[in-house]
Amino acid sequence: YAPVIVDTARKYLAAQNSGRIVKDLTGAKFEDLLREVASNHPVAIWASIDLVDIQEVYAYTIYNYTETNSDGSTSTPKNLDVYWLENEHVYLLKGYDLDRNVVIVNDSLNGEMEYDMNRFKECYEQCYKQAVIIY
């Protein structure tokens, strides 16, 4: 999901001549995200609703799916099962308190919330470490 958000945000901000920078931080260590927050760069981060465990759920099958190879040829058609992450949710990570081991986030479902830092990190990792910043 993050690459699509990054691409769309870059196009929009360029059209607005905003000068803002968009970075895809997917794969970043959680501690690196905290450093961004400490630098006054809130981070959009994928985790799960109410920090429940993520489940991969079968969604549908693409029949006769082919990929285009680097030489322009296509792969042998195959059936591709597509899964999605149940209970996935995006938060805006905007602060943290190491003494209390909590993160402070804006949550579109619950408003400003504090969550246990270790659990939040686990959920971030379950969602393939997806994160985006705009500054």
Give the residues covered by each predicted segment.
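Cysteine-nucleophile protease catalytic domains, especially the papain-like/related folds used
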Residues: 1-42, 128-135
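Noncatalytic regulatory segments and standalone regulatory/sensor domains
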Residues: 38, 51-53, 57-135
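A short, Trp-centered hydrophobic/proline-enriched beta-strand micro-motif
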Residues: 43-47
